[in-house]
Amino acid sequence: MPTSVYVSFDAPEGVPATPRRLHAALSAVLDLPPGIGPARASQFPTLAHRPPHGAGSVKPYSLGELCHSESTFGVEVRFLDDRLVDTLDAWLSWGGVMRVGAGTEDDAVLIATEGQIINQASWEELAQQDQDTAWEIRLVTPTTFSSKGHHVPNLSPATIATSLQQRWWTWNRRLAPPRIDRHAMASVLATQDFTHSSTVSLVMPRNSGQGRLSSRQIPAHEGHLRISGVEGAEATRIFSRLMALSAYTNVGSHTSFGM
């Protein structure tokens, strides 16, 4: 069941909370421990659902909203597989200590003070949410899209929908919306694009399956956009269902790096 959890931390000032570093810290909690592969983990109920560390594929968890003040730090963690919520809860019960940084003595040490489920929906409920016709989309972190090893420069409703559909297919193919019709979406969905381009640095793992990059500098999108659709159109209804899932996951490529 897709679930969103907000975790509060006691934190020092100046937490080096880049998305990539936060994702790395979170993966140390939720991924399989180093040296344990999926085949061996499948024999143990407490490990079978945890994703392998270092895999380039989309993981069943992602970062959401962040907030911080002088002494507290909070992060939303989104789950497509709620069994990982039990993993997070077990970690919290053992103190919830998280190191964020570059792996040096200057790392910030955070101590979890509270974890709370803030949103939850069944796949059946998400599949029925097809009545919305307008969306305000804010990109929380720099977001980039690629296909067959090549970057996709344009940010369109179909691009976002395809990314969300891939996640839905991975975690619940039975209830997933049908295959995206890009032409139909382009004809009924209008976009006001307030995003801008930025450049981020990234090195792809060899086992990512996303192709080797010719450059470590990758174009990304930041900002927000508004999308509106023709009421009653099938493509609008499909987009509505997919956007319902966006509350529990992320979009784009290279998300295993925290983007």
Where are these predicted regions, by residue range?
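RNA-interacting cores
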Residues: 1-259
